[in-house]
């Protein structure tokens, strides 16, 4: 899947210590490709959800200590499995991301801020929490602050992309 993204990730990843970069790249690749499955292209919803379920099966295989046997996904999930094992990353955070991306496939509007906040809890906050795990810095205070930052960045992204999202039939502003 080839989609251009206007993100700062390539530059930001250079600011990470070299020992963390492979794990950061694996997390990013997982999140970026799963989000693209949900949001990009013209595949029907049933196909998008099936691909996201392939990601769920791969995560389950990682939890069981097994290799994922899909040759197309094996490189991504082999790298992710190494990062999960090396840093003790909670697989549930990756599931939260997949739940949010699956929600993107069918949900186009949010009734209120509480509903939108719940979406941010699953679509943005897991990334900050995973980074805190990499740095072994997941104190309650850090987790709370990370969640605030990640939710804020997600909301800013929604406001920046209002026109693009409206063209796709999605409205994130309650």
Predicted regions and their residues:
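Acidic catalytic motifs of isoprenoid enzymes
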Residues: 1-174
């Amino acid at each position: 899947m080839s989609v251009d993204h206007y993100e700062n990730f390539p530059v930001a990843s250079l600011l990470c210590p070299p020992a963390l970069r492979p794990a950061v790249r694996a997390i990013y690749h997982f999140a970026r490709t799963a989000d693209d499955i949900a949001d990009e292209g013209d595949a029907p919803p049933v196909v998008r959800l099936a691909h996201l379920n392939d990601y769920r099966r791969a995560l389950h295989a990682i939890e069981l200590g097994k290799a994922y046997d899909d040759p197309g996904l094996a490189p991504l999930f082999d790298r992710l499995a190494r990062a999960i094992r090396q840093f003790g990353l909670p697989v549930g955070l990756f599931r939260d991301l997949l739940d949010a991306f699956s929600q993107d496939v069918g949900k186009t509007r949010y009734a209120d801020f509480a509903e939108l906040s719940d979406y941010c809890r699953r679509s943005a906050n897991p990334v900050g929490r995973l980074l805190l795990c990499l740095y072994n810095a997941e104190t309650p205070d850090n987790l709370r602050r990370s969640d605030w930052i990640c939710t804020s960045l997600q909301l800013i992204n929604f406001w920046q992309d209002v026109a693009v999202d409206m063209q796709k039939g999605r409205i994130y502003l309650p």
